[in-house]
Amino acid sequence: MSSLGRLHLITDNRPGQDPLAVVRAALSVARAELVVQVRVTDETTDRQAYDLARRVTVLCARYGATCLVNDRLHVALAVGADGGHVGADDLPVGAARAVLGSAAVLGATAREADTAVEAVAAGASYLGVGSVHPTTSKDGLPPPIGAAGLRAVAAAVSVPVIAIGGVTAADVPDLRAAGAYGVAVIAALSHAADPARATAAFVEALTC
């Protein structure tokens, strides 16, 4: 999937955050190189998730960027997103593929080579692999897999591998060397004082 963007922005809609402002800033810099994954808190209603995903889908379309919806695949279908992403506790990859259809982009989360191979066989278009570093963006995660774990997964599959978990722009060269096609971030953009400038740093690192 050579057309998949290398920088994945996962939205943060927790109190005090403005996900649409961050998406706009990131799109203005990364344009079609950006993939926006609409992820919302468990407390977010489907209507709220729909409203956010619909607006993000429209923004992404203006730049030729990809919009995915995490977990809530019915929302992805309702807003006409490009696809979705499922984690370990979400729908099985095969079931998610059946829901979204053969043409959709479908991401899946993996930490180990065997589960990565299974996810690809079930229909995953790309894999989000990690957490590669410690992160505070999600509670209850297992220990980070590091560059060695990322390398093992990347060597086992032929689809793009997206490194996630505590990633900074400075980490990109080492992650690319370990086999990552791109990176996924939350705090590095959503909590940045200047999201556009932070996006530019990632784009530069990913295109070197």
UniProtKB/Swiss-Prot annotation:
Binds 1 Mg(2+) ion per subunit. GO terms for cellular component: cytoplasm. This is Thiamine-phosphate synthase. It catalyses: 2-[(2R,5Z)-2-carboxy-4-methylthiazol-5(2H)-ylidene]ethyl phosphate + 4-amino-2-methyl-5-(diphosphooxymethyl)pyrimidine + 2 H(+) = thiamine phosphate + CO2 + diphosphate; 2-(2-carboxy-4-methylthiazol-5-yl)ethyl phosphate + 4-amino-2-methyl-5-(diphosphooxymethyl)pyrimidine + 2 H(+) = thiamine phosphate + CO2 + diphosphate; 4-methyl-5-(2-phosphooxyethyl)-thiazole + 4-amino-2-methyl-5-(diphosphooxymethyl)pyrimidine + H(+) = thiamine phosphate + diphosphate. Coiled coil: none annotated. Belongs to the thiamine-phosphate synthase family. PANTHER family: THIAMINE-PHOSPHATE PYROPHOSPHORYLASE, THIAMINE-PHOSPHATE SYNTHASE. Its cofactor is Mg(2+). HAMAP family: TMP_synthase. Keywords: Magnesium, Metal-binding, Thiamine biosynthesis, Transferase. NCBIfam families: thiE. Transmembrane segments: none annotated. Mg(2+) binds at D71, D90. Its EC number is 2.5.1.3. GO terms for biological process: thiamine biosynthetic process; thiamine diphosphate biosynthetic process. 2-[(2R,5Z)-2-carboxy-4-methylthiazol-5(2H)-ylidene]ethyl phosphate binds at T135, T136, S137, G166. InterPro entries: Aldolase_TIM, ThiamineP_synth_sf, ThiamineP_synth_TenI, TMP_synthase. It comes from Salinispora arenicola (strain CNS-205). Condenses 4-methyl-5-(beta-hydroxyethyl)thiazole monophosphate (THZ-P) and 2-methyl-4-amino-5-hydroxymethyl pyrimidine pyrophosphate (HMP-PP) to form thiamine monophosphate (TMP). GO terms for molecular function: magnesium ion binding; thiamine-phosphate diphosphorylase activity. Pathway: Cofactor biosynthesis; thiamine diphosphate biosynthesis; thiamine phosphate from 4-amino-2-methyl-5-diphosphomethylpyrimidine and 4-methyl-5-(2-phosphoethyl)-thiazole: step 1/1. 4-amino-2-methyl-5-(diphosphooxymethyl)pyrimidine binds at Q37, V38, R39, N70, T109, K138. It is an enzyme of class 2 (transferase).
